[in-house]
Structures are given as structure tokens and as C-alpha cells.
Amino acid sequence: MIKIKKGLDLPIAGAPVQTIQDGPAIHHVALLGEEYVGMRPSMLVQEGDQVKKGQALFEDKKNPGVLFTAPASGKISAINRGERRVLQSVVIEVEGDEQIPFEHYAAEELNQLSDEQVQHHLLTSGLWTALRTRPFSKTPVPGSRPRAIFISAMDTQPLAADPQVIIATESEAFNHGLTVLTRLTDGKVHVCHAAGQAVTRHTNTQVTYNEFSGPHPAGLVGTHIHFLEPVSQTKMVWHVGYQDVIAIGKLFTRGELCTDRIVALAGPQVNQPILLRTRLGASLSELTAGKLKEGDNRIISGSVLSGTAFSATHGYLGRFHQQVSVIREGREKELFGWVMPGRDKYSITRTTLGYFFKRKLFAFSTDMHGGERAMVPIGNYERVMPLDILATHLLRDLLAGDTDSAQALGCLELDEEDLALCTFVCPGKYEYGPVLRDILTQIEQEG
């Protein structure tokens, strides 16, 4: 077992009850193009076309053969593009339940499948896009093989669902998915779970189980990779979400594309935080209708630390998100707030009274409590960074754009979510995730 000591479990109110309920009917779903790093789409459909679930919508020009398929049947109601015609979203108005059938196999045949068979099946169904590489967090190139594959069967994000509750409902499909993944690598398939949890073991010795304990980010795949299979420019691993492993298992044994998604709807502004069964790419406005407290709320696809805020073109459940968080918009001004004791304000330093209430849960809002200022190294980053990385030095070099030094300090091991806590505790209010992405893109382009 690997014990994480540094980190932070955000004391936010509105944690979900770990019970699964059916969500409301969803009438609009979408694929969000900007979730796929470096992807350049070649469109295969246009607005007004009727599509079936599993039908290809577009192909990646940079990765020929990588198809992005429809998560539901219906009509293409909108194809939204941003600046320089960057694809933002492809919106489908859900109609019926027609789907593309795929080849399927008996459970005992899965171990005999070739690498080429598995890759072809994942590519044609669109489930290949559930895989991501580390470094760079991109969709893998068809034909490549990773040193290892990681599945995080734990989640320490604030307000997250317990993965074991969800996996328990589809344990057979989950194990079938693990069997399929073993065909894609000569290395280990790492299943990382919380310490003390009872996990059904796979019979294939290629599948290994690793226990992690401690505060967030103990549940992040970046943490697991760092301690088990550190990556570099010459060593690549893949990772995939636990619900996508279930979908892979169902694809190969039933011949159907499963786009179900169980998400935690939680946060201080949710009336009854709970787990909801919905579908991939679901409209967030439809998913949360009638479930939120009145007021000016911010709906976030994903975690409050690293999720994507609701907007007209991005108002849908993200491909890699397992939760929907809702907090209050902090637009109001507080008179002489800087001299108040701050009983209801959380801080990791002794700057507010809230620091001393260790068991108190706070109704966080979007208020930043101050504007951007110079980066001040007072030890906050080191408190929440459990990886063997010089946090302050790395963050400084990211802001300075020093790719050589950032690479030497370990930036290739990181993704945006790995620096979310550093952003949260930063006295200077810097957003380190986008800066990291710019540096990673520059490193990749320069070789």
C-alpha cells in the first residue's frame, strides 16, 4: 500500500449520498471537441443529418482511423465552432434508440483476441478515444503499445462518487474490460483502489491491484503513475476511466456501444446530492433541472478543482468527467471583508478564523477573495504536492516559459488536474493548468 501524506481534502458541503438513481430524460447530448488535446476533426456529418448511436461523426486528421462516434441516435442539431474554426461541440437532438451493431465474442474468447482485433474494434466503435496517453494526455496513435495501462478505481476529488459502488453494479463487464485491455500491452494493467476496499480480483496475473490511501490527490491517475510507472519522453503509459472499462467489456461481449454514465450531482447548491444514471455528453441544464437551489449558480462538468464551467457551447457532460458540481457565483461585494475574522471562509493558512474549524464544511462559491498578484512562495504548494517534485521551482518555470527546466523538474508526468490544488492554494491566484498545457504542447512540438 502507498500512503499519501501531503494533499488536501477540500471541506466542501454537499457531498452526495452514495445511492444510484435514474436521472431525468435527456433530449440533447454533445461531443466536446476541445476535450481531445491536439485533435483536428475531419467532419463526416453536417447539421440536420440523422445519425445512429455508434455512427462516426468525425475523424482525427492527425490520427487517421481514430473515429469519434455518436453517443445517441437522433438529429445533428448544431456544430459549434470557435475562433479559427476550432470545433467546440457537436450537438445531437436525441430521437429513438437506433444503434450500430458491432461484433461480439464469448467471454472465454477474449483472452485469445489479437492486438489488431482489439484495436480495430475500439477504433470503429469510438471507444478508442476513452484511452489517453501520459505524457501529453492525448488519444493514442493506432498501432502503438504502452508500457502499462492504468485504471483508477478510486476517486478523491471533492464531492466525487465512490467508484466501488458503481463498479459493483457491473463487476462482470468490468472484468471483461480488463481482459480486453491486457491484449493492448505487454506490461501490467494497474487497477488502483482505495486502501481497505474489498475488490474482486481478476484471474489474469497481468492485472495488478495497488492500494493508495491519503488525501486528494491520492486518487488521481497522475499520482498512481508517478509512484508505479514514472513516464518520460521515451516511456509512455495509457490510462482509462473505470466506467469506460465497463463500456469496453460490454462492447466486446454484447456488441453494443454503452454510453451510460453514472455521475455524482453534488455541491452546496444542490438540493439532494446523489448519484444519477444518465448518458455520456448529457445536457447539464436538462440533467440539473429542478434539482438546484435558487440563486445565481455555476454548474461545472467535473470537479470544482479542475472541471469545465457551463456555457452555451460547453453545457454538456464531459467525456472524462464522473461528476457534476454546483456552487454559488460569488458576485457580491463584502464591505471591509479584509478586516473580518472570516469564520465562514476556508484557508489552509492562519489568515481566517475558518482555518481553526477542522471539521466544518464550507459552502464554497466562485469568489477568489482577491485579484492576481505576484507569485509568493510561502510553502502552500509543498503542502498539497505529494509527488517527488520541487513544486515551487516547477511552477515558477512554467510561468516563465522555461521548457527545459520544467521538463527536468518533471512536468511530463503531469496533467492539468495534477496542478489543480496548487491553483487553489496559490496566493497569487494563478491558473497553472492552462500554463502547463501550453508548455507540454511546446515540448511536444519541439521534440
Curated annotation (Swiss-Prot):
It catalyses: a ubiquinone + n Na(+)(in) + NADH + H(+) = a ubiquinol + n Na(+)(out) + NAD(+). Keywords: Ion transport, NAD, Sodium, Sodium transport, Translocase, Transport, Ubiquinone. The keyword Glycoprotein does not apply. GO terms for molecular function: oxidoreductase activity, acting on NAD(P)H, quinone or similar compound as acceptor. GO terms for biological process: sodium ion transport. Its EC number is 7.2.1.1. Composed of six subunits; NqrA, NqrB, NqrC, NqrD, NqrE and NqrF. Belongs to the NqrA family. NQR complex catalyzes the reduction of ubiquinone-1 to ubiquinol by two successive reactions, coupled with the transport of Na(+) ions from the cytoplasm to the periplasm. NqrA to NqrE are probably involved in the second step, the conversion of ubisemiquinone to ubiquinol. This is Na(+)-translocating NADH-quinone reductase subunit A. It comes from Yersinia pestis bv. Antiqua (strain Angola).
